[in-house]
């Protein structure tokens, strides 16, 4: 099982690193001779995606091929894949199976002690230690320069199991450290280098430090091909941003993987905070004001700190498996690892490989003019408090629309003209005022028409991935069930080595298949994004709009039919029972029907069972026929609109688009009561932690216990809030545009946003007291202040951290009253006004006079 780990284009060669069948690493240079295609009249066995004949045109070098593309671009003459790394992988690695345990991954972290955080673009201060975990060796290598004392293994606070795997290399000087580390790096050159925030700091700093101390030749020796690319740009905030590319080594910043693939927003992305929320484990704490003092005064804990930093990233991946996810996507698409982080390249390669197998030729990448197109439909909610809410959502809406309408570049027939806005046109289709005479053509709501006699490339590919995901989900479930059965057997009969091994293997296989299904899910969800990206090979603005327009039609169409049915059953006229709709979902007010049938008087499972039956009836009698009728009305290729019941909620409220809360009794058949809160401050990472907790409880009381209980809670919560630690009531933001909003002395200027003021005040105090400053773009926590000797009304500090000891006196000036009003009462008032609740007891004339 030979598999590539890196392929780089350098000059006329493709420079490849690969692992052979026995697990040994190799390098080779290949003088690749690419093939492109041009149209012809004769039959050759090759056709473009439109069915026209093509013949191959071979080139001796990649340079010649690139030159030919450039020279003929204006004539639209040349066809084929112009990314020769993708074509080479496709030629050589037809079966891309891999074994993660054979791919060498380095997890690194560097320390550069200084009073202020040094810029990676200049690397001005020495590197005093480097931590490096090698997954093949399963060891932590730590290179360090002692300061006040030596690092002693027996004095370490690191866990014993980590110490057993730690190899400490003592160095006398920075040059010795860098020379020894370079020797080690070249002996065990990783295929992948990862770590936390290494793209912005560690890797550019290491590269620039080697350049500063030893020159470019030594710097380039970090690359197995002797070539390191360094680029520096200036961002919108005037900061120099340095990016490096060590050719032959893929850089996968774990911070970037976490942001891209976990689909959660955090108030802070500091490793310390992420480690705590994901692993319940933090960095090693230190008392010093900055890293320089930490290094100089406590070298023992300084090295322990480094080991723990590397270990946190290692443990995060053991839990999240984002490295496996990324590598799986890379090999599935047939691209380099780091290319997975791009928006369009994975699908570009997937479609190319699929068409190549059928001797179909992709069009050449063209420059497209971007444009705006209709977005998703969001129905304005019926603001207020509601009972008996059922929601239904469409399965994989945008991918399903692509399949239903057969949307693809080569299936386009044309676009029907229409008067007025697209929104008006969709409404007319819903009203039955527009007809589509040609049965042989599939239609979307924006007038686009597609062939039905051939299946489009895009629908075919998304269907393949869809079914692969389904198969992997099934396998993951089977192995998970197997693990449950083995665990039950061990509980009943006792554990044996054989059963334990079988259990671990089942869990391992379940995780692998789960990662594979997640990889497919990511691909499915990303295709529509690629389709609407002007840099995508198969981009067409009309197709992108055809998808969203049909999505709007699908929701409006079914809402019409649900309303017709409920009005008939409940004997009402023109009542809108669809409380809200958003992209692929509708939220329906079933309370009048539940009242008619007496279901609203039931409790517990009796209520939920009967309510579920009502929704099942609506699915069967209304929704399914509705989408079958839509498919026939629009003459689409095949029906792919399938809507399932999602939540059953006894109560709920809506206050604006994308802002609502539901007391869910059942979610897709799973009886696990919980609150579903969307868009309200409880869900915002900027909301203080204690306010998130307080608002969530207030919402629970509103939905489950009523106004009196809410008033009782708010009265007691105010006392809890004002007695809480300041970190619990701090609100989170980002320190952006600090240079823009400050003068040459670092003072806030005119129009400076409040949170930026707080960061600038903090940095002024940092200069005075010698602790680390807040950097541009950092996540910060902010608190309001009462009168103080500095005359400032707020202070920021690094999110997830605390105020430095030197300015801890400001804790006594935290303005709890203002924070309480602004961060708790203000959002609670917005909810209360919308649902006509009073969050505090008011005295009326009637109550006053008894």
Swiss-Prot record:
The keyword Nuclease applies. Mg(2+) 4 binds at residues 393-394, 584. Replicates the viral genomic DNA. This polymerase possesses two enzymatic activities: DNA synthesis (polymerase) and an exonucleolytic activity that degrades single-stranded DNA in the 3'- to 5'-direction for proofreading purpose. It catalyses: DNA(n) + a 2'-deoxyribonucleoside 5'-triphosphate = DNA(n+1) + diphosphate. The record marks 582, 658 as: Optimization of metal coordination by the polymerase active site. The N-terminus contains the 3'-5' exonuclease activity. The C-terminus contains the polymerase activity and is involved in binding to the polymerase clamp protein. A beta hairpin structure is necessary for the proofreading function of the polymerase. Residues 228-245 are annotated as: Beta hairpin. Mg(2+) 3 binds at residues 393, 584. This is DNA-directed DNA polymerase. Signal peptide: none annotated. Residues 657-660 are annotated as: Binding of DNA in B-conformation. Residues 98-322 are annotated as: 3'-5'exonuclease. InterPro entries: DNA-dir_DNA_pol_B (IPR006172), DNA-dir_DNA_pol_B_CS (IPR017964), DNA-dir_DNA_pol_B_exonuc (IPR006133), DNA-dir_DNA_pol_B_multi_dom (IPR006134), DNA/RNA_pol_sf (IPR043502), DNA_pol_palm_dom_sf (IPR023211), DNA_pol_type-B (IPR050240), DPOL_T4 (IPR034749). Its EC number is 2.7.7.7, 3.1.11.-.
């Amino acid at each position: 099982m030979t598999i590539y780990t890196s392929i780089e284009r350098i000059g006329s060669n493709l420079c490849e690193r690969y692992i052979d069948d026995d697990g040994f690493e190799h390098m080779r240079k290949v003088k690749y001779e690419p093939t492109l295609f041009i149209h012809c009249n004769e039959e050759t066995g090759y056709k473009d995606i439109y069915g026209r004949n093509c013949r191959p045109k071979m080139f001796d070098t990649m340079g010649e091929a690139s030159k030919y593309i450039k020279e003929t671009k204006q004539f639209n003459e040349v066809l084929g894949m112009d990314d020769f790394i993708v074509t080479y992988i496709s030629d050589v690695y037809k079966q891309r199976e891999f074994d993660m345990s054979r791919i060498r991954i380095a997890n690194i972290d560097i320390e550069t002690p200084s009073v202020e955080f040094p810029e990676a673009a200049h690397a001005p201060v020495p590197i005093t230690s480097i931590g490096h975990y090698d997954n093949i060796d399963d060891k932590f290598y730590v290179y360090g320069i002692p300061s006040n004392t030596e690092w002693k293994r027996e004095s370490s606070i690191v866990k014993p199991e980590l110490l057993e795997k730690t190899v400490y290399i003592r160095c006398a000087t920075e040059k010795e450290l860098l020379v020894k580390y370079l020797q080690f790096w070249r002996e065990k050159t990783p295929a992948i280098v990862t770590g936390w925030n290494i793209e912005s700091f560690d890797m550019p700093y290491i590269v620039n430090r080697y350049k500063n101390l030893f020159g470019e030749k030594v710097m380039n020796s970090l690359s197995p091909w002797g070539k390191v690319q360094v680029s520096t740009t200036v961002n919108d905030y005037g900061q120099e941003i340095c990016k490096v590319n060590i050719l032959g080594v893929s850089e996968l910043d774990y911070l970037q993987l976490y942001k891209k693939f976990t689909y959660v927003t955090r108030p802070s992305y500091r490793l310390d905070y992420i480690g705590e929320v994901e692993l319940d484990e933090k960095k090693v704490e230190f008392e010093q004001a900055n890293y320089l003092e930490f290094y100089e005064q406590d070298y023992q804990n300084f090295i322990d700190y480094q080991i723990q930093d590397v270990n946190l990233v290692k443990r995060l991946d053991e839990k999240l498996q984002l490295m496996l996810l990324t590598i799986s996507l890379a090999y599935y698409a047939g691209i380099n690892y780091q290319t997975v982080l791009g928006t369009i390249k994975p699908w570009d390669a997937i479609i190319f490989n699929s068409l190549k197998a059928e001797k179909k030729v992709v069009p050449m990448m063209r420059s497209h003019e971007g444009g705006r197109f209709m977005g998703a439909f969001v129905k304005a909610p019926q603001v207020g408090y509601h009972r008996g809410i059922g929601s239904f959502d469409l399965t994989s809406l945008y991918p399903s629309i692509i399949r239903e309408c057969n949307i693809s570049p080569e299936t386009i027939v044309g676009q029907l003209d229409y008067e007025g806005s697209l929104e008006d046109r969709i409404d007319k289709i819903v009203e039955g005022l527009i007809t589509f005479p040609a049965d042989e053509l599939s239609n979307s709501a924006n007038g686009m028409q597609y062939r039905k006699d051939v299946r489009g490339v895009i629908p075919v590919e998304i269907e393949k991935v869809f079914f692969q995901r389904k198969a992997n989900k099934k396998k993951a479930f089977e192995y998970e069930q197997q693990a449950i059965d083995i665990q039950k057997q061990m509980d009943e009969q006792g554990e044996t080595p054989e059963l334990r091994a079988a259990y671990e293997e089942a869990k391992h296989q379940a995780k692998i298949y789960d990662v594979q299904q997640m990889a497919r899910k990511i691909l499915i969800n990303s295709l529509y994004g690629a389709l609407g990206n002007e840099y995508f090979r198969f981009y067409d603005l009309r197709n992108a709009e055809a998808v969203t327009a049909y999505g709007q039609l699908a929701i409006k169409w079914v809402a019409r039919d649900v309303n017709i049915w409920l009005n008939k059953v409940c004997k009402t006229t023109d009542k809108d029972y669809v409380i809200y709709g958003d992209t692929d979902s509708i939220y329906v007010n079933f309370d009048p029907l539940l009242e008619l049938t007496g279901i609203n008087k039931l409790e517990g499972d009796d209520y939920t069972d009967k309510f579920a039956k009502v929704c099942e009836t609506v699915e069967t009698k209304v929704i399914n026929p509705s989408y079958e009728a839509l498919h026939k009305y629009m003459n689409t290729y095949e029906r792919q609109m399938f809507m399932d019941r999602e939540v059953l909620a006894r109560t709920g409220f809506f206050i604006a688009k994308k802002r609502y809360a539901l007391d869910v009794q059942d979610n897709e058949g799973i009886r696990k009561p919980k609150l579903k809160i969307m868009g309200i401050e409880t869900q915002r990472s900027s909301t203080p932690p204690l306010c998130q907790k307080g608002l969530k409880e207030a919402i629970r009381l509103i939905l489950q216990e009523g106004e009196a209980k809410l008033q009782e809670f708010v009265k007691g919560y105010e006392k809890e809030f004002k007695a809480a630690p300041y970190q619990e009531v701090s609100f989170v933001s980002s320190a952006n545009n600090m240079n823009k909003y400050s003068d040459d002395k670092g003072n806030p200027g005119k129009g400076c946003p409040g949170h930026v003021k707080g960061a600038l005040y903090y940095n002024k105090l940092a200069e005075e007291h010698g602790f680390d400053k807040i950097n541009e773009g950092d996540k910060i926590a902010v608190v309001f202040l009462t009168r103080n000797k500095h005359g400032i009304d707020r202070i920021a500090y690094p999110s997830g951290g605390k105020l430095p000891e030197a300015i801890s006196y400001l804790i006594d000036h935290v303005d709890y009253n203002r924070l309480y009003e602004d961060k708790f009462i203000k959002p609670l008032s917005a909810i209360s006004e919308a649902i006509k609740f009073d969050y505090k007891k008011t005295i009326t004339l009637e109550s006053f006079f008894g």
